[in-house]
Amino acid sequence: MDPIKEALTYDDVLLTPKYSEILPSETVIKTKLSKNLNLKIPIISSAMDTVTESSMAIAIAKLGGIGVIHRNLDIKRQILEIRKVKSKNLKVGAAVGAGPLEIKRAEALLKEKIDLIVVDTAHGHTKKVAEIVKKIKKLKSKKTTLCAGNISTIDAAKFLSKLGVDAIKVGIGPGSICTTRLVAGIGVPQLSAIMAARKGLGKKKIMLVADGGIKFSGDISKALAAGADAVMIGSLFAGTNESPGKIIKKNGKYFKSFRGMGSVGAMNKGSADRYFQKKQKDPSKYVPEGVEGLVKYKGPIEKIVYQLIGGLKSSMGYLGSKNIKDLRNKPKFVKITKAGFYESMVHSIDEVKK
């Protein structure tokens, strides 16, 4: 057995400030997921059935990012959601799985001239993922960007890069409603996972998407500094006007549903194969790797994205980084203690004014 390594996530570290001549307002946060897919902001909305359908994808695209339409829909309904976005001349992505019938979904989606197709599985370092990636590469045009995941190791990054994907999705278990690390005991803390994937790619011009675990705008800066080209966000966007589902009133407060794609509800709706399980008539036969619950109603997505982008720009100002490439130029992380983490949070105040 190899020595047990230490692995870190966003809350374990801080970026140390550098000499700067750059103001936050002067920073440029555009990025790309391939030669043909440029984004004005490094934000992607997650392919979750309580996060991204056409309303979310339209809103994110208008703000400069891209949304990925989830695959817990029949093919016709997923295409309908895509067309709603494309009818406004906006960029859109769509998710497919690695199951035996998913190539039919991929064929249908690619006919819609989507900008991004995502092979969305819980474990991207597998034979099944390799098989569908190879098939999609033969079908897709050069204008459609191919992303596959999820992974968290050097070897997995090398594996997917050899298949010729444009982008790789990193993250096994960091999401707020994901229980893979508890149920399966599998995963790598997200910051270390991003660094491992970037190391595995070497000098290859393959983009990384950090998927999961973003709680604050500062986490985006840490993810990009560690090697990501964009972040995928779920929980922060759940509960907004644009997320699927109705507003629920409970005890005088307003909520919307939010669930992991590994929850029983989501798996029963169609995402079971994402976790390499079969659809069951009896829900108790699932081994869920996610939970389902409620999140507070948050209003329009635009306000949230504005704060996230503002925080990222502020971070880049502290680091003297004009753009994301500069942000990744020899960043200096410091590992912090539990006391350092608590010091970073709001403290010594009885009530925060909202």
Model regions and ranges:
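Alpha/beta catalytic cores of nucleotide-metabolism and tRNA/nucleoside-modifying enzymes
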Residues: 1-21, 95, 163, 185-210, ...
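Active-site entrance/lid segments in N-terminal catalytic domains of soluble metabolic enzymes
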Residues: 1-207, 237-240, 343
